[in-house]
Amino acid sequence: MKTKGIVTGIVSNLVTVKVDGPVAENEICYIDLQGVKMMAEVIKVNGETASVQVFESTRGLKNGDSVEFEGRMLEVQLGPGLLSSVYDGLQNNLATMTEVFLQRGEYTDPLDHQKKWAFTPIAQPGDKVVAADWLGEVKEGWLPHKIMVPFSFQGEFTVKSIIGAGEYTVDQEVAVLTNEEGEDVKVTMVQKWPVKVAVKGYKEKPRPNRIMETGVRVIDTMNPIAEGGTGFIPGPFGCGKTVLQHAIAKQGDADVIVMAACGERANEVVEIFTEFPELIDPHTGRHLMERTTIICNTSNMPVAAREASVYTAMTICEYYRAMGLKCLLLADSTSRWAQALREMSNRMEELPGADAFPVDLSAIISNFYARAGMVVLNNGQTGAVTFIGTVSPAGGNLKEPVTESTKKAARCFYALEQNRADQKRYPAVGQLDSYSKYLDYPEIKEYLDETVEKGWVDKVLQAKNLIRRGKEASEQINILGDDGVPMSYHVNFWKSELVDFVILQQDAFDTIDALCPLERQRFMLDLVLEICEKDYDFEDFEKCREFFKNLINELRQMNYSAYESEQFWAYNESVKKMIA
């Protein structure tokens, strides 16, 4: 029998409920508001009183309204049809909700239960299976979508029967499994899983051992992110966080992209809706939307559902990872999620931490980032979830609690700088603050030595040192004037400008420059370092400036030319003559 309760207090979307039976933290309940059932989640239990956060507007709610507890946590439906879909934070399918405004208490089914999928069995009767083992597969777009033993199954099962190849709906029975007690359990293509619990179905979780290509030079060359790695992009408003994330989403070497628009402005999400269905994936030649799921919880949607949206997105990624696929999760912006946590913590009158954020903010963010990673599945294949979040610190202050907490959890840090954005040096990632801890991993060094070239990490560090020396020279020139410093200061400054303009800066709206393969990045960095290793002797700083400006112009034109085209080699020849 379900536990029931009545509303005893309301503070915005925090509601206190007196219950008549046992309830658990994170349990889902429905509050009855004049016939409209509003979903809520238990966040604290104290004796007979439960504090619940409501995922809808509580306008019109009053003391005495009835509440019914479901006895389950917030769950997502997992099955064929997740890709190309647009959901809100509670996994309501927004494509089937046609009104301009979403009505309170209106919840839709995330999957199409009428559509038939072409099923091909993988397992055989008599096979021994455990949770997350593959039973069969259906084609979802061009991806092989594995139908698995539900993650909630515990212990070993024997496949009693499995249906033959054919077209079936997601609700039809595809297999019957027998558990260790001899009981038969039916399996369909759909399973449910609570979003706040990490999906376990794998053998081990090793350290990442290869990088994920994004086509963005400032990431792949200077601060690479590993496949199954974590990174975050903090920066003030208008610095290009969203454009950089969109570039990674379009070009990232991943099978599945999940974008969680968590508390961002609606127009940025609309941009994805309009662009992605038309854009072609450079890796497969198919439409980008075919491999993308969007979890859309914009700034004008309920604040409480922001937390649900990031967990829903991560659970969908973990589901596809269990199929042996490479997944990329982009959350924009995790600051909004942290603000939702702060709002709820303050309403519950908990002890505040720094800037009134919850005291356990660091632990919450770390636990979430820990769900990403590369895994070895039970059958020996590998899957990965790579997570990149953006952080919007108030006033661009990178010392605020959300940035500091995320820094502890993420392995890559891409700090966007206001002054670089003001100078239109995009992407505005500042090299002196940004880092990738993966460059210290022996596995990653070995991978880069094999796939790019021997001693690649040393070359990257050499380029970073050029930028550092150029920054120091620039400060001295600004203080003492052009004539007040030795010529070597001018040369160091212009060498750093060369690295900046040719390697760090990239045009996200140019068809050629937007996507830069690793092979091309290797060629360009080698060329730039070859130029910078030479000794130059100029009569005065104006000659130095003119020489490097002409050189930068030729190299920029190379970036806009198709790799290894006649035009590309012509510019290359011109550069060689200039430095001869």
Label each region the model flagged.
Residues 539-580:
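C-terminal amphipathic alpha-helical interaction region
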Residues 43-49, 80-91, 142-166, 184-199:
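Short, compositionally biased
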Residues 54, 59, 119-128, 158-167:
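Short histidine-centered loop motifs in beta-beta connectors
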Residues 39-41, 54, 69-73, 146-147, ...:
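Short beta-alpha junctions and helix-cap segments that line functional grooves
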Residues 20, 34, 72-73, 91, ...:
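Short, surface-exposed secondary-structure boundary micro-motifs
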Residues 221-222, 228-549, 564:
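P-loop NTPase catalytic core
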Residues 97-140, 145-152, 169-229, 244-247, ...:
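P-loop NTPase nucleotide-binding/switch module
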Residues 1-103:
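N-terminal accessory targeting/assembly segments
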